[in-house]
Amino acid sequence: MRDEKLEKIAVQLYDPKLQYHNFDHIRFVLGEGEKIISRCKKEGVQVNESVVYYAILFHDAGFLDNHLTKGFTSKEAYSADLAVKALKGNGLDKELVRKVEQAIMATHVDALCQTNEDKAVRAADLAGLAADYTVFKKNTIDLKNEYEMMSGKKITWDQWKTMAAERIEQFLREDLCLTSDYFNDRGESRFHVNTRANIQKFLQDKSERIDG
């Protein structure tokens, strides 16, 4: 599904100066969300496509802003508030808006998913972790550059690798199974197996260059 009016509103909430949390990231996650929805439909898994779409669209909105000075405890809470204002302002159903807000909060590192929509949004957001290593590495480099820009601090490649690996592991505490293809023939989560393989390769990677 597409909502061109809301997409035009959402894109204004993503700063192109950000190397990772920009609207290109949203386009990628929307694509991953569509794949998840398609697999759910094939297996008869109930997922509200509108909730997933709108939650992904706004899940990193306002990322460059200082959420603390705006009265929010996390970037996810701030993004969720921006989503609620945009969706309510355009006449969307209150219950749908509530579910979108919840699904955005499910992308927080410490969150536990309560619904299939929560799982779909979190899984789509994290899909790049289990992608080909070239995609994984580009994302981690973009995140490093973004971190340095936002914090005003330089960090060595080795320091970043350790920080990033520890952070990624925090996102692996929960299975996000919605469809049968989530597990491999050995009953292991493909997402966890592929992500941990990327982490191991990343920790051994001496080069900060994408093609290195």
Model-found features: residue ranges?
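An active-site-proximal "capping" alpha-helix that borders the catalytic cofactor pocket
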Residues: 29-30, 74-90
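Short alpha-helical hairpin
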Residues: 1-12, 25
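Divalent metal-dependent phosphate-bond-processing catalytic cores, especially two-metal-ion Mg2+/Mn2+ enzymes
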Residues: 17-48, 58, 92, 109-212
